[in-house]
Amino acid sequence: MLNLKRKNIKLLDCTLRDGGYYNNWNFSKTFIKKYLLEIEKANIRNIEIGFRFFKQKKKLGSLGYSKDSFLKKLNIPKKINICVMVNSEDFLNKTNNKKDHIFNIKNKSRIDTIRFATHFRDINNIIPYLKEVKKLGYKVIVNLMQCNDRSENE
């Protein structure tokens, strides 16, 4: 049985990032600020605020891109660590213009952690990008998807 009293387990609140699937990440700045204050009151320290998508044809709200310039306007409480999710396939897609999607060095960003949603088949191909982002000063999380049918050896 899993011992949930372990000190190294950290909660990552994904409410805004996950909720964005219902409204294209189009939350008002007022709503986001209120939400962040409530998260702080609840003593939650890690929040995945949104995605950092490549430019899309479809219009997305501010948390679909989670640009540094937008995050700075939110006055995020200092105790809260900000995470954004990226789709690994976006980095592996040769048709994307990566210049539109480069992360700043960590000390110029309010983002602390970048979580890569990665299919099992892509894990080896995404490693150079994980290293690149880590060199910029960010913490990196890999969300390994579609691995339930893999063997223990894989």
List the predicted regions and their residue ranges:
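N-terminal glycine-rich phosphate/pyrophosphate-binding loops that anchor nucleotide-derived ligands
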Residues: L2, F27, K55
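N-terminal small/glycine-rich loop or linker at the start of catalytic domains
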Residues: L2-N24, K78-K79, S109, K139-N143
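N-terminal glycine-rich anion-binding loops that anchor highly charged ligand groups
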Residues: R6-C14, L36-F53
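N-terminal phosphate-binding or glycine-rich loops at protein starts, especially the Walker A/P-loop
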Residues: C14-L37, A42
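Active-site beta->alpha loop and helix N-cap motifs at the rims of alpha/beta catalytic domains
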Residues: E40, N46, F51-E154
